[in-house]
Design a protein with these regions (language model features):
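Receiver (REC) domain switch-region micro-motif
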Residues: 38, 82-83, 162
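A contiguous active-site-proximal alpha/beta segment in oxidoreductase catalytic domains
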Residues: 112-169
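Alpha-helical structural signal in soluble globular domains
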Residues: 26, 30, 53, 97, ...
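N-terminal Rossmann-like dinucleotide-binding module
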Residues: 1-56, 77
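Short, well-ordered coil/turn segments that N-cap beta-strands
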Residues: 33, 59, 80, 103, ...
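Catalytic cores of eukaryotic secretory-pathway lumenal/extracellular enzymes that build
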Residues: 33, 42-44, 92, 117-120, ...
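Beta-loop-alpha module in the N-terminal Rossmann-like domain of NAD(P)-dependent dehydrogenases
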Residues: 60-124
């Protein structure tokens, strides 16, 4: 591992998962993180294959995020942060598992599926010594930043309607 880089784990984001690749690209561009562990799929076979694709040591490839949280928290060189890029309904349970072990959490949006889950996650974050961060990944795109600046400056006048299309393959 490169000196000074944050040891990152990832939950979700394995083969055929769109948003995991986006987070990995951002982590590489930022150059402050190194992906060293993962529970990259809900099926063990696919999780291990995805980890192999990404060059993760097989001993740090997990078929279950709970096993990953437990083991990584005990390792001297365990992950310092985890990116949660699972399907939306899994954000809260996975995040709480890592917060319980004082591992920093970077969670993709949305926060949770329900207000009750959100309140439970807030309590877990308050009890933890770790940070919880919710990403809104497109806010950092140059095109989005430019649009925000143009609107804030009033360059387009008073907006009455905004129509946006989002194409994703």
């Amino acid at each position: 591992m490169a000196a000074g880089k944050i040891r990152l784990g990832m939950v979700g984001g394995g083969r055929d998962a769109f948003i995991g690749a986006v987070h990995r690209i951002a982590a590489r561009m930022d150059d402050h993180y190194e992906l060293v562990a993962g529970a990259l799929s809900s099926t063990e076979e696919k999780a291990l294959a995805s980890a192999a694709d990404l060059g993760i040591d097989p001993k740090r490839a997990y078929g279950d995020y709970r096993q990953m949280a437990i083991r990584e928290a005990r390792l001297k060189d365990g992950i310092e942060a985890v990116a949660i890029v699972t399907p939306n309904h899994m954000h809260a349970p996975a995040a709480k598992e890592f917060l319980r072990r004082n591992i920093h959490v970077i969670c993709d949006k949305p926060l949770t599926a329900t207000l009750l889950e959100a309140k439970s996650l807030v309590r877990a974050a308050e009890r933890s010594d770790a940070l919880f961060v919710l990403t809104h990944n497109y806010t950092g795109y140059p095109m989005v930043r430019h649009a925000r600046e143009v609107i804030a400056n009033g360059d387009l006048g008073d907006l009455r309607v905004v129509q946006v299309e989002y194409a994703q393959d």
